[in-house]
Structure formats: structure tokens, C-alpha cells
Amino acid sequence: MFAFKRSSCYFQVSNKIVKNGQIRGYISVADRVHRVTMFKMPKAEDQQRFLEQCRKMAADNQRNGSPYILSMVAGPAEDGPRTEGYTFVNKTEFASMEDMKYYETECPAHGEVKKVLGEITIDGMMTVFFKPQATGGA
């Protein structure tokens, strides 16, 4: 979801990107609100059903007539000794705390996700959110 424009001898991040035919301003990863939810979802069929609803939410999310979730990734957790029973992870990124609050309380697409959660086996969940204080990577 990055847009680059060529400068004289290097590429730089553009402040505008086009997604699904709409021009949107670019918000750096460090300025976003990152929300991570982990689920203890033991049944593979429940994980698959939930994953399908996450895909639908990624496509259908709207606020004021435009998509507002900047990034959404979801999937089963890789098995390992530190998972503490968490089997599924969803990470969303928002431009502001207000967008995240809308997501949690008013978003119809997220409401459909919550309905599915009420119909499948969940043995526990944990949600955290933050604005990055350090970023990096290759």
C-alpha cells in the first residue's frame, strides 16, 4: 500500500496513493493506530469461518462513504512454544484513535465480524492497541 514517486536519483514516499480507484492520503506507519487482537479459537472450521468474515470486512469497511481501515491482516497463528493457546491473530491499522473507536462501536462491517464471534467457539481473546514509538526494517 505504498506509493513511490521518482525523484532525481531516488524514490520517495508519495503523500497520495490510489486504491480501488480512490485517491487517498498516505499516513506513515508510525502515525497509525495499530490494533492487535489474538484469539484462542481451537476449531479449524471456526478459524476458517472467521477468516472469511475478516476478508469481507476488509472489502466492505466504510466510514463517511470511504474505506477507513488502512491495513488489515488476519490468519491462524503459527504453532510454537510461546503462543500460550492463542491460535488466530487479527491486526488492523487506523489513521486515528477516532477511526479505531468507530471500528469498535459503530462499523457495520466489524459488527458482522462480532456476530460471527458470538456463533463460534472462543476460549479467550486479548486486544491491545498502540501508536509506534520505534519503527525500522529493511
UniProtKB/Swiss-Prot annotation:
Pathway: Secondary metabolite biosynthesis. It comes from the Eukaryota. Gene3D superfamilies: 3.30.70.100. SUPFAM superfamilies: Dimeric alpha+beta barrel (SSF54909). Pfam families: Dabb (PF07876). Residues 33-130 form the Stress-response A/B barrel domain. Part of the gene cluster that mediates the biosynthesis of the lipopeptide fusaristatin A. Fusaristatin A consists of a polyketide chain linked to three amino acid residues glutamine (Gln), dehydroalanine (dehydro-Ala), and beta-aminoisobutyric acid. The biosynthesis starts with formation of a linear polyketide chain by the highly reducing polyketide synthase PKS6. The gene cluster does not contain an acyl-CoA ligase or an acyl-transferase, and it is therefore predicted that the polyketide is transferred directly to the nonribosomal peptide synthetase NRPS7. This is Fusaristatin A biosynthesis cluster protein FGSG_08206.
